[in-house]
Amino acid sequence: MNSFSARLRSGASRNRFAAVAATTGLVLGLTAACGSSGGSASSSAGSGVIHVLVYGDAGNTVEKQIVDTFNKTSKVKAVLDTIPGADYQSKLNTIINTPQAPDVFFNWGGGSIAPYVKHNLLLPLDDMIAKDPGLKSNFLPSVFNTAVIDGKSYGVPMRGTQPVLLFNNKKVLASAGLSVPKTWDDLINDVKVLKGKGITPIALGGGDQWPTLMWFEYVFDRLAGPDLFRKALAGDKSAWSGADSGKALGMLKQLTDAGAFGSNFDSVKFTDGGSPALLAKGKAAFELMGSWEYSTQQSGNPDFAKNDLGYSAFPSVQGGKGDPKDVVGNTNNFYSVLKKTKHPDAVAAFLKLMYSDEFVKAQLGIGNLPTTTNTANFLSTSASPDYSQFQFNLVKQAPSFQLSWDQAYPPAAATPLHTAIQKFFDGKTDADGFIHAMQSLSNS
């Protein structure tokens, strides 16, 4: 992976919230927003064109390549339209129910498309899958299921996966006589030892808020299993007030009370390189972060990345209901289809290319890790084969891959969710306050 990959991952995966903040529902205006042609799902019928709308960033090189491949053999031609990343979600909402709507569009699955499903704008892909089972079977199930809503499939993975891993500074651990923690108790012990040596145990970009959320996602999964969050997301507000929720919050408080993150983590950010620098310079031993941490370190601290950057799965919790192989993070990005497309057969043919060898090799070439079953055949060609293999095995073996909470919920829930987790970590609200805040989130 390279510096470009770091920007791609932290951009398309995390920065959607700036675009979403002012866009809490569907805006049914008539403003065109596509970056190339002004066609649409409805107006392109006679011209034999399908419009593919994507998040505008450097990853578009692969998307353009795949569109060009499709156009070599298809009578119906595909046109790639882009919206600059910072404007993507808001402008998509503006055009999604207008004549300027695309046939196919980029999204994050989960909550990012739930409002469109609710408004009956998307085409379930189940009929396409019945005709071509490969549209489902050629993808890792834990990833594909992120775009399944109410039992129907609404998306095909189209970029790379981004699991959250526990990164470490191998030199710091060795000097402290510690090894990578396998269990929660191991982690708590490591925190105490590192604190005693004057080292901040865990780097945390609390100023960004979303890095803190990763701790909640894993602890809740390890302790309660994935069903607690699934029930909450489905509208069962009592899930947050159950015994398992209380235990998970107790574990998180145990971590903060032990001083695991130091005293000023809310003034540190990942996005400006602050928390990665703490890890690289040996001022912290661990950082829980998405897989883009690796390429971030390769870019900013190449010697550290080459020699001393370690990574592992999140520790298990003794007696917990969650499988130690469960993963959280950003499962992938997806292509979804507008119900009013005039060329569903052409769209189906286009989507088939998302599991082609060409697609896999092209994504690996820019530092992404595709989630197709044939990806394993090409991992040796990636920029960091060992790291890619570790991630792929982790995702492939995961019984559950929980999409980040702030992406599983609809966009309007992101800010109150981030505020709730920050206040709990800061000690400004107790468990009851956190539970009340989570029960107040809108899941529609």
Write out the residue ranges for each language-model feature.
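Hinge/lid segment of periplasmic solute-binding proteins
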Residues: 110-164, 188
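Short, solvent-exposed loop/beta-turn-alpha elements that line the ligand-binding surface or hinge
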Residues: 126-139, 206, 223-247, 300-304, ...
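Glycine-centered hinge/linker elements that transmit conformational signals in sensory
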Residues: 193, 234-266
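Short helix-initiation/N-cap motifs at beta->coil->alpha
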Residues: 82-91, 110-111, 184-189, 265-280
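C-terminal capping/gating helix-and-loop segments adjacent to ligand/active sites or protein-protein/ligand interfaces
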Residues: 369-376, 388-442
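Extracytoplasmic/periplasmic solute-binding protein
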Residues: 154-158, 164, 188-241
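Conserved N-terminal structural module of periplasmic/extracytoplasmic solute-binding proteins
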Residues: 2-114, 119, 131-134, 362, ...
